[in-house]
């Protein structure tokens, strides 16, 4: 093999985030094409891609060289740090670079404005494992050379040479587009000769080919928030910064062959080694010098004794059951110790039990871990695995060595406290969370590139929305253009070729950094000994620079601390119950056979019930009539694509339909699911019973079936048949059973996970059944910012007889508050425009000074720090001041006056003396008067901040009237050929169907809401009247819809009318209710104007009421009016909608 002439060392991959678009896979392929024996990457201030690069190089037979392009602090110009490249020579260098990068992001003396290395760290630390390149024209030497300051350049070179003895190289770069760099090259060569330093040639690679330059510029603009045409934006890169072949470098540095030779020399000096596949658990302290094994055995046996007392209070029954449990416990402990995982179990039980004893609710289990009796004994999980036939081997298989993985659900609001406990126990440097990489999906990249190209938002938005989804993920641009012809048509029509060209090059490129939802790393020392650590800013949590897959590869153990909203709801509900009733409820101790709770499921009254909220699940529950916990476990497992097909058979068999087991030997394991294979554990047990597999071997079979590898399946089929033959089962029957298992293994669910989640489902249903107001108040408090969900829960509460009390500055808190007798006080925090700090300032003022007496008093006592004009407006519009002043319009008109008055009083109070004596003499502030809003105005304003109508409903004033011609309430609909419906339109959306345009109209009355489809000629006839915030009368056909949402009804409009049109057509008379404040003269003039000749006219009926009496007025026969939209609109404006009624 010929000696290489050049090894690339300086290269930014896509993991430089703000620039660089080299994808590692393509880089390795091109390096192989160039015949490179070694290759380096040097991302900017990070090692995000190092492990991926290392593994890819090793697989391709290329020597990996790890490095980082680092910023180094510049005391003379802090906003212009110098650059250098630090290359890993050996294990010590790997640790040192990791330490330096970590310090740049999380160190106590880091630069908080941008990540950089403090020169003192380099001066005072051991850099012997690193090689340093000077940074060419961006380095301290190069910057001084280009500025003509040779003395400073010399001083800098000597400094770096001292920091990196025999490992500092003067870096040389040449680009045809950058002739100004040549001064740095010549100066560096001269200085190197003078000081006896080596030189090395690098090429600053940013992308793979020359035609990637424009895409790279777009990438830089996306990261920096610029547009491509911005003349002021940085232009740091050139088209020549692509991955060039060694021959090009040989030509460029023909006059300096030693600079090329030194790239090879550096490659030889560097031996990066990353240990992969070995796990490093933190050290768990044990008492009394016990080994980890002995301490696990001790805690497990003690925990089992405690659990057995809970499970079997009767001593005789407990004694009878104990041998079975003890045998299972000993079996599990032997495997855990054999696989060297006692430390893992001890660590997990420690932070879970800390959480449970410190007010941090923990879920009963999640994933396959609920199948472990050791976990149950240690209180890691809260479900008896023997009772529900949960298998330990599904969690930890001695025949397939891999780390156990407990997924632990914590209450969302307390999860951070548990992580903080772990930090304190093991040391902050030993704990971090895990980075995730956000990429530019096809939908996102269209919007991003469109922005930097300054294309119309509507065009990019439309293109993005045209990209179809597959399994909830957008298709690639290539596939989307093949699938959706409109994309290509739009590109051609709008001349958007450049958008697509750039977007394709950037698609799926790493765009940003995030944090893994639950993963927490605990290392047996500093995290940075295994992975550098990154922190976005002061408020963020530290994360590893390696993502989930990479940290596991380097041996760090991930512990999943997941936040589950429903645990927060349960905790809040239990607190609510204690506050309203005094009852102390622990959902972990409620009986699992309470038929009051199961009635919630039988009635499909499962809004807010964990895992059972969807329309499809409710439809299934209505037919199922469930009575026991095992059925809930099955429903959690069945209601997913694939298994859903078995729901009808499952429900029918639940109700008594006869069925046969596929083989009598399987009756024991299939009886709980009525002969249907639902769980992965059943597949494993069937393999054990029929095929003679161990449960560990059965787990391997299950995995093989799930992966559908033909060669493995052939092998397993024979093993299974041999085992079946020993049971006297024919090959034909054996193959039938195997095929049946194979079918279910593909989508069978993990029973351990289903059982744990079914338990939370049951607990939430139990709370809803026994303490509905307390539970729903907690549920709504968990969704304060989600208006759609709040409306959904509000409707459910009303359907269950819960009354809502309005928001009130003198009664409400930040969250929803339950009251006795099925009442909930609306939360101030659910009003848009408020916030927790603002509401806390209200409640604090209320607690210290009593109830507020008016707007002036409120503004004087609540600090301006959290109570700005926008928040005050929101509270008024939402009705929170109604108890002290119902005129919301007047309050809004006086906000500035009230806030100014509060400021003046505060200023006077600070002055003291004279102002104290004058306080009583100051004339009281007079509020500006303003007419009250009409009911419709009040509701419209209220909806802007509540998100829906709370104090009333805009349909209310019309309900009595329209029921004369549309008597059917929306919650009483049933399939029928023709029905006339009436309601208030809350939303209209349109879409293109197979037969043309379709509109979906959301219609509400006082009983409920439906969605009505309007299409074809009906849509053409009424397109102008399909608008939100008005009453419509709709002739409809109602049919059963087994596939749609709602209550399984499909409503199709045949005719649509506005209320005004319906009045014109069908009105028989007009009733007006008059009061003293009405303008009678104006009314007479209005009515006279609508006595149109030669038109159909209707008679008037007048009534009058004041404080003392009421009565009907005799109206002369000549007073008839022409019914019209104009008349009704003018009357409602003059008298109010409640005073105008049409009789049909």
From Swiss-Prot:
Q: Which UniProt keywords apply?
A: Cytoplasm, DNA replication, DNA-directed DNA polymerase, Nucleotidyltransferase, Transferase
From what superkingdom does this record's organism come?
Answer: Bacteria
One of the record's GO cellular component terms: cytoplasm
Q: So what EC number does this one have?
A: 2.7.7.7
Question: In which broad location class does this protein mainly occur, judging by the first location in its UniProt entry?
Answer: cytoplasm
Name the Gene3D superfamilies on file. Answer: 1.10.150.870, Bacterial DNA polymerase III alpha subunit, thumb domain (1.10.10.1600), Metal-dependent hydrolases (3.20.20.140), Nucleic acid-binding proteins (2.40.50.140)
Annotated GO biological processes are: DNA replication
A molecular-function term among this protein's GO annotations? nucleic acid binding
Enzyme class label: transferase
- SUPFAM superfamilies documented for this protein: PHP domain-like
**Could you tell me which SMART domains the record lists for this protein?**
POLIIIAc
Annotated localization: Cytoplasm
* The keyword Transferase is assigned to this record: yes
Query: Does this UniProt record's set of keywords contain Chloroplast?
Result: no
Known catalysed reaction(s)?
DNA(n) + a 2'-deoxyribonucleoside 5'-triphosphate = DNA(n+1) + diphosphate
Q: Which Pfam families match?
A: DNA_pol3_alpha, DNA_pol3_finger, DNA_pol_IIIA_C, HHH_6, PHP, tRNA_anti-codon
Q: Assembly and partners?
A: DNA polymerase III contains a core (composed of alpha, epsilon and theta chains) that associates with a tau subunit. This core dimerizes to form the PolIII' complex. PolIII' associates with the gamma complex (composed of gamma, delta, delta', psi and chi chains) and with the beta chain to form the complete DNA polymerase III complex.
Q: Which family does it belong to?
A: Belongs to the DNA polymerase type-C family. DnaE subfamily.
Which miscellaneous remark does the UniProt record hold? Present in outer membrane vesicle formulations which are used as vaccines in human.
Protein task: DNA polymerase III is a complex, multichain enzyme responsible for most of the replicative synthesis in bacteria. This DNA polymerase also exhibits 3' to 5' exonuclease activity. The alpha chain is the DNA polymerase.
| Protein name according to UniProt | DNA polymerase III subunit alpha
Q: Which organism is it from?
A: Neisseria meningitidis serogroup B (strain ATCC BAA-335 / MC58)
| Lineage per the UniProt record | Bacteria, Pseudomonadati, Pseudomonadota, Betaproteobacteria, Neisseriales
């Amino acid at each position: 093999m010929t000696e290489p002439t050049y090894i690339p060392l300086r290269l930014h991959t896509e993991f430089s985030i703000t620039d660089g678009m080299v994808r590692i896979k393509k880089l390795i392929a091109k390096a192989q094409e160039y015949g490179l024996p070694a290759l380096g990457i040097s991302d900017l201030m990070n090692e995000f891609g190092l492990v991926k690069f290392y593994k890819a190089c090793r697989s391709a037979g290329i020597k990996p060289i790890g490095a980082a392009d680092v910023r180094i602090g510049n005391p003379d110009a802090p906003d212009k740090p110098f650059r250098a490249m630090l290359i890993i020579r050996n294990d010590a260098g790997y640790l040192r670079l990791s330490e330096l990068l970590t310090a740049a992001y999380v160190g106590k003396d880091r630069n908080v404005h941008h990540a950089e290395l403090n020169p003192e760290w380099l001066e005072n630390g051991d850099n012997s494992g690193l090689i340093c390149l000077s940074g060419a024209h961006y380095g301290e030497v190069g910057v001084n050379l280009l500025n003509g300051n040779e003395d400073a350049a010399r001083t800098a070179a000597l400094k770096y040479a001292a920091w990196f003895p025999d490992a500092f190289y003067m870096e040389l770069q040449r680009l045809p587009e950058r002739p100004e760099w040549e001064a740095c090259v010549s100066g560096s060569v001269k200085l190197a000769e003078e000081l006896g330093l080596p030189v090395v040639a690098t090429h600053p690679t940013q992308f793979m080919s020359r035609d990637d330059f424009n895409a790279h510029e777009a990438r830089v603009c996306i990261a920096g928030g610029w547009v491509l045409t911005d003349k002021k934006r940085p232009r740091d890169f050139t088209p020549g910064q692509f991955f060039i072949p060694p021959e090009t470098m040989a030509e460029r540095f023909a006059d300096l062959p030693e600079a090329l030779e030194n790239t090879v020399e550096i490659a030889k000096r560097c031996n990066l080694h990353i240990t992969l596949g070995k796990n490093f658990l933190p050290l768990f302290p044990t008492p009394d010098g016990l080994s980890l094994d002995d301490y696990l055995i001790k805690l497990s046996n003690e925990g089992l004794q405690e659990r057995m007392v809970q499970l079997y209070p009767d001593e005789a029954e407990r004694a009878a059951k104990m041998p079975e449990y003890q045998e299972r416990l000993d079996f599990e402990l032997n495997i855990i110790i054999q696989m060297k995982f006692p430390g893992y179990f001890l660590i997990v039980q420690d932070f879970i039990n800390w959480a449970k004893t410190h007010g941090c609710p923990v879920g009963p289990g999640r994933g396959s871990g609920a199948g472990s009796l050791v976990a149950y004994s240690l209180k890691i999980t809260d479900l008896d695995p023997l009772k529900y036939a949960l298998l330990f081997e599904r969690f930890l298989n001695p025949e397939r060595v891999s780390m156990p993985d407990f997924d632990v659900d914590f209450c969302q609001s307390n999860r951070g406290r548990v992580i903080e406990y772990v930090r304190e126990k093991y040391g902050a440097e030993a704990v971090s969370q895990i980075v995730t990489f956000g990429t530019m999906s096809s939908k996102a990249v269209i919007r991003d590139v469109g922005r930097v190209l300054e294309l119309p938002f509507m065009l990019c938005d439309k293109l993005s929305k045209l990209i179809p989804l597959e399994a909830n993920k957008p298709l690639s641009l290539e596939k989307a253009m093949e699938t959706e012809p409109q994309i290509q048509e739009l590109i051609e029509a709008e001349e958007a070729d450049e958008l697509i060209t750039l977007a394709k090059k950037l698609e799926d490129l790493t765009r940003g950094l995030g944090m893994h939802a639950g993963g927490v790393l605990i290392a047996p020392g500093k995290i940075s000994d295994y992975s550098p650590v990154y922190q976005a800013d002061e408020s963020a949590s530290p994360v590893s620079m390696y993502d989930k897959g990479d940290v596991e590869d380097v041996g760090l153990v991930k512990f999943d601390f997941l936040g589950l909203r429903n645990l927060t709801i349960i905790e809040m509900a239990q607190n609510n119950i204690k506050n309203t009733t005094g009852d102390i409820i622990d959902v972990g101790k409620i009986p699992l056979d309470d038929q009051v709770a199961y009635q919630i499921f039988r009635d499909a009254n499962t809004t807010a019930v964990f895992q059972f909220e969807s329309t499809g699940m409710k439809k299934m529950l209505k037919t199922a009539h469930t009575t026991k916990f095992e059925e809930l476990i099955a429903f959690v497992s069945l209601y997913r694509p694939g298994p859903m097909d078995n729901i009808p058979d499952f429900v029918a068999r639940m109700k008594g339909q006869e069925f046969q087991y596929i083989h009598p030997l399987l009756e024991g394991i299939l009886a709980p699911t009525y002969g249907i294979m639902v769980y992965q554990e059943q597949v494993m047990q069937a393999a054990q019973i029929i095929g003679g597999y161990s449960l560990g071997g059965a787990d391997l079979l299950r995995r093989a079936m799930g992966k559908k590898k033909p060669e493995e399946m052939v092998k397993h089929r024979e093993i299974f048949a041999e085992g079946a033959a020993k049971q006297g089962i024919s090959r034909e029957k054996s193959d039938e059973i195997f095929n049946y298992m194979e079918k279910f293994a593909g989508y069978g669910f993990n029973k351990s996970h289903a059982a744990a989640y079914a338990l939370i489902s049951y607990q939430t249903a139990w709370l809803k059944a026994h303490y509905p107001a307390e539970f729903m108040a907690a549920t709504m408090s968990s969704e304060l910012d989600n208006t759609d969900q709040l409306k959904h829960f509000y409707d459910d509460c009303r359907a269950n007889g819960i009354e809502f009390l309005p928001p009130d500055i003198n009664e409400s808190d930040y969250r929803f508050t339950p009251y006795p007798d099925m009442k909930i006080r609306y939360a101030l925090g659910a009003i848009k425009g408020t916030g927790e700090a603002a509401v806390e300032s209200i409640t604090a003022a209320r607690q210290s000074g009593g109830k507020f007496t008016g707007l002036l008093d409120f503004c004087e006592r609540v600090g301006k720090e959290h109570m700005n004009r926008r928040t005050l407006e929101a509270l008024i519009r939402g009705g929170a001041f109604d108890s002290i002043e119902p005129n919301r319009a007047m309050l809004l008109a006086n906000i500035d006056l009230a806030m100014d008055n509060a400021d003046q009083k505060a200023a006077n109070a600070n002055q003291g003396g004279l102002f104290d004596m004058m306080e009583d003499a100051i004339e009281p502030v007079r509020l500006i008067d303003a007419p009250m809003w009409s009911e419709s105005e009040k509701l419209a304003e209220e909806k802007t901040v509540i998100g829906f109508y709370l104090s009333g409903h805009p349909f209310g004033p019309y309900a009595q009237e329209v029921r004369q011609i549309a008597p059917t309430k929306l919650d009483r609909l049933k399939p029928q050929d023709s029905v006339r419906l009436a309601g208030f339109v809350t939303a209209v959306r349109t879409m293109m169907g197979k037969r043309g345009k379709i509109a979906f109209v959301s219609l509400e009355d006082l009983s409920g809401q439906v969605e009505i489809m309007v299409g074809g000629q009906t849509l053409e006839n009424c397109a102008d009247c399909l608008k939100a915030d008005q009453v419509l009368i709709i002739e409809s056909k109602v049919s059963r819809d087994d596939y749609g949402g709602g209550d399984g009804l499909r409503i199709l409009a045949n005719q649509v009318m506005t209320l005004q049109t319906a009045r014109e057509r069908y009105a028989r008379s007009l009733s007006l209710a008059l009061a003293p404040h009405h303008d009678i003269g104006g009314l007479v003039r209005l009515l006279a104007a609508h006595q149109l000749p030669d038109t159909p006219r209707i008679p008037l009926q007048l009534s009058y009421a004041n404080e003392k009496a009421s009565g009907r007025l005799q109206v002369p026969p000549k007073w008839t009016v022409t019914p019209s939209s104009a008349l009704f609109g003018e009357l409602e404006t003059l008298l109010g909608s409640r005073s105008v009624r049409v009789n049909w």
